[in-house]
Amino acid sequence: LKMKLYRLKILLPFLCLFVLGSASPKMTGEEIGKYIQKKLKRNNHVLRINSKNLGDDGVAYLASSPILKTVKTLILYKGHFGDEGVRALAESENLDQLTTLYLENNNITDLGVEHISRSENLSNLKVLNLYHNQISDKGAGLIAESDTLTELQELNLIYNQIYGPGVIQLTNSTKLKNLKKIELTYNPIKKSAKDA
């Protein structure tokens, strides 16, 4: 029994570190501001933020920053944000130069896609990457019917919840005339839509 308690005593700190350390604390607005200034000093056209706990409020702070006016590529990977963060990006006048938007591994649903697909500020997008979110056929359909994403050339919807109708809408879209590449693997697409 003493040996088991001893092992548990040794393993407990590591277990706590694993469980509690898996999500870093949310970044404050001040931390985000300093971080993006540092990143944009290297290249003021590309901002990549990987595995930082931004949350919706952090993304809203980011979107409101005038320093983003020169950014053409924005990559927010595992930022722990959802539809409200996407709304802030879509409404930001600081992102009208954006041509490439990567929002991989977040909590974006069809509502977030709706914000993107209706945004005049994101009308220059050529690449949209929504890999591993919670987007369904409805979200794919919103992109397919978008009047503002007409410049889109590449779309990544890998690892979402698209079953079929969204695939058909995307492949038959009359609005996405420049779209050359659609990535849809690892979606539960039904056989009837795979031929689209």
Question: Model regions: which residues?
Answer:
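Eukaryotic tandem repeat interaction scaffolds
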Residues: E104-N105, T109-D147
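Leucine-rich solenoid repeat scaffolds
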Residues: I158, I162-A196
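Leucine-rich repeat
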Residues: K39-V46, P66-T73, E93-T100, E120-V127, ...
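LRR N-terminal entry segment and analogous cap-like coil->beta motifs
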Residues: K26-G29, G33-A90, E104
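Bacterial Sec-dependent N-terminal signal peptides
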Residues: L1-I32
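Consensus "Asn ladder" position of solenoid repeat domains
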Residues: K52, G79, L103-N106, L130-N133, ...
